[in-house]
């Protein structure tokens, strides 16, 4: 047998224990930490967004997104806690209520909150797309009533699609433990799960709740980035300037939109594939457990962190956050001072480079003009040897107190003669030169 075959056999023989280990690490240690970060962040965001300062329609979508993500983090934390208790000898699996929660609520609530968050992001991206691409129609189209209807629809669509999942996906089973003299409740796959009609429902649900939002987000955000690029080029052509602070903010927004698209693709597609493939047989395989753990962690991380990404790019949000939590003002001020120092340093370096280039040009002009003056003086001296100096010129030279015994023309006279055609320039020290 080849080495690869031996390794494959070894993995398959130890896969149940290894799969359980992977599941314990992912769901008992990693996911609770991510959920804690998401819960703290979204509660903070709801407190900040409750301010009167942030009453624009766009912030309605952000508040709805915070609610959906907060519910998702809470549902995941409850799921992880109950699974941990059930696997570590707790009596929680001896209650019928826990079986009802496992079969009909546990995964349904998590997936409903995830789907609602995704559709809220779609509604927010659509609002942003109309404001950028169709600014003339945005004022009449955008209203709190329309935003409220969009948010309600975003929460209703996943709920409707997950009703059959909640009712028929799993069935309850029970066994009597003779050692403990108690009834143990658990869940198992329902037979309807293998039927053709269920497969149609499953693929339709995942296509509408997972893949369709990813496609919509990708198309909308790409269109927004293209519109920003066109606006940047138009601005640069009209003003004939290089990139400044405004265009740098546009670049930051485009990077944020591109990151949103990338996060949607990377974090949501594996989770969608996982929901299409999952069954009790696959759960015993090590490779599937690794894929499932990574997919779930990516999806939860996306929903725990995407609100930070949206709000970190809003100046109004940061200002309101510092008003709500003044203890962070010192750190924020220190960071601003550091950024200001870096910007000033870069500006000084660029200015010094520009001044050095200008000074070199001016020195070259001075050297060129000095060479021309020396050449003119030399020709004048040659001309004076052959032509006598007129009396009035000598009188002027003597009256000015300059020596004329050498027969040389003074440089001041040359400047007077040619000053009418020479261009005088002043440098930064008010030094005049040709």
Curated annotation (Swiss-Prot):
CDD domains found in the cross-reference section: 7tmA_FMRFamide_R-like
Domain of life from the UniProt record: Eukaryota
Membrane-spanning intervals of the chain: 30-50, 65-85, 105-125, 147-167, 208-228, 258-278
Topological type in the membrane: Multi-pass membrane protein
Family annotation (InterPro entries): GPCR-like, GPCR_Rhodpsn, GPCR_Rhodpsn_7TM
Subcellular location: Cell membrane
Keyword Membrane in record: yes
A single MF term (Gene Ontology): G protein-coupled receptor activity
Function: Not known. Putative receptor.
Family statement drawn from the similarity comment of this UniProt entry: Belongs to the G-protein coupled receptor 1 family.
Protein's UniProt name: Probable G-protein coupled receptor B0563.6
Taxonomic classification: Eukaryota, Metazoa, Ecdysozoa, Nematoda, Chromadorea
């Amino acid at each position: 047998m080849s080495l690869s075959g031996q390794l494959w056999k070894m993995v398959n023989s130890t896969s149940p224990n290894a799969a359980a280990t992977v599941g314990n690490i992912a769901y008992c240690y990693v996911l609770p930490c991510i959920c804690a970060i998401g819960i703290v962040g979204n509660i903070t965001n709801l407190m900040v967004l409750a301010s009167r300062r942030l009453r624009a329609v766009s912030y309605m979508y952000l508040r709805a997104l915070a609610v959906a993500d907060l519910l998702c983090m809470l549902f995941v934390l409850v799921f992880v806690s109950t699974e941990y208790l059930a696997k570590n000898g707790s009596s929680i699996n001896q209650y019928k209520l826990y079986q009802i929660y496992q079969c009909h609520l546990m995964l349904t609530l998590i997936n409903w909150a995830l789907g609602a968050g995704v559709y809220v992001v779609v509604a927010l991206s659509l609002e942003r797309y109309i404001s950028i691409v169709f600014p003339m129609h945005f004022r009449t189209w955008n209203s709190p009533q329309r935003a409220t209807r969009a948010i309600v629809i975003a929460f209703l669509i996943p709920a409707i699609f997950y009703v059959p999942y909640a009712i028929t996906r799993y069935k309850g089973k029970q066994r009597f433990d003779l050692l403990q003299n108690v009834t143990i409740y658990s869940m198992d796959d329902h037979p309807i799960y293998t039927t053709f009609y269920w497969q149609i429902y499953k693929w339709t649900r995942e296509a509408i709740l997972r893949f369709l939002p990813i496609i919509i987000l990708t198309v909308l955000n790409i269109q927004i980035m293209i519109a920003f690029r066109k606006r940047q080029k138009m601005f640069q052509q009209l003003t004939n300037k290089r990139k400044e602070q405004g265009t740098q903010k546009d670049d930051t927004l485009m990077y944020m939109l591109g990151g949103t698209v990338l996060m949607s693709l990377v974090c949501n597609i594996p989770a969608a594939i996982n929901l299409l493939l999952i069954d009790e047989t696959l759960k015993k395989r090590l490779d599937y457990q690794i894929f499932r753990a990574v997919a779930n962690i990516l999806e939860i991380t996306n929903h725990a962190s995407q609100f930070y990404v949206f709000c970190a790019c809003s100046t109004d949000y940061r200002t309101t956050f510092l008003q709500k939590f003044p203890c962070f003002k010192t750190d924020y001020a220190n960071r601003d001072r550091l950024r200001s120092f870096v910007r000033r340093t870069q500006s000084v370096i660029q200015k010094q480079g520009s001044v050095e280039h200008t000074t070199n040009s001016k020195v070259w002009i001075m050297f060129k003009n000095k060479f021309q003056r020396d050449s003119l003086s030399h020709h004048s001296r040659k001309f004076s040897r052959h032509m006598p100096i007129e009396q009035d010129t000598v009188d002027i030279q003597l009256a000015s107190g300059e020596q004329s015994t050498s027969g040389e023309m003074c440089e001041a006279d040359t400047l007077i003669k040619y000053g009418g055609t020479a261009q005088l320039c002043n440098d930064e020290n008010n030094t005049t030169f040709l």
